[in-house]
Amino acid sequence: MINFINRYGAEIIQRATEHLYLVTVAIFIAISVGIPLGILVTRKPKLKKPILGFANIMQTIPSLALFGLLIPVPVVGGIGDNTAIIALTLYSLLPIIRNTYTGIVGVDPAITQAGIGMGMTDMQLLWQVEIPLALGVILAGVRVATVIAIGLATIAAAIGAGGLGVFIFRGVATVNNQLLLAGAIPAALMALAADFALGFVEARLSKSTLKTINDE
């Protein structure tokens, strides 16, 4: 084991950094797109079915197939990081859109009516009342999306995007369990760390939301 760490330790750190980069960029884009789409659905209910339907379809496509389908797409496709990031972003959209929608429509109508009674515009109501109260639910969606992205990012190695999946594919090709574990264990630890950190923030936000509601 010591010899293995001495031999592959530096590469494990390098691949973990690549893995984290892919996931971080993909989740940032998914948040930037998913939250506005979730808000849009609350304002335009007719768009709920097509938007959530598209996100659901993305979830049903096998991950390796989606990576492969994106390769020949002009501009965004090809071998490397860009294709992997786009694929991870598409997979991350559903929980973020769905939880944003659920969190906002789940705000107590009495609170929103009180805001309307105070003369708030729709935008003021959204930013000062609905989003603050829905943050815990929205973050839960981000949490799920992040864990999913960390797991799926291992497939990115198949299209030359690097990451911890390099060890996994190399281990499968050479029937080497040590290489498999060198990719699988850090990826699992990364997912657990992200889940714990975001879960902690989510719990704090939920407590803050309950306190706000009780104060009202």
What would you call each of these model-derived segments?
Residues 6-21, 52-58, 71-75, 135, ...:
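Alpha-helical membrane-interface segments at transmembrane helix boundaries
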Residues 11-40:
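Transmembrane alpha-helix signature in integral membrane proteins
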Residues 14-22, 72-95, 135, 183, ...:
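Loop-to-helix entry region at the N-terminal start of transmembrane alpha-helices
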Residues 37-70, 98-102:
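Cytoplasmic-entry segments and transmembrane alpha-helices of multi-pass inner-membrane transporters
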Residues 72, 152-181, 185-187, 212-215:
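Glycine-rich helix-loop "coupling/hinge" segments at transmembrane-helix boundaries
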Residues 99-138:
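Short cytoplasmic-facing helical segments at TM-TM junctions of multi-pass membrane proteins
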Residues 105, 117, 124, 181-216:
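C-terminal transmembrane helix and the adjacent membrane-cytosol boundary/short C-terminal tail
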Residues 123-155, 182, 187, 194:
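Transmembrane alpha-helices
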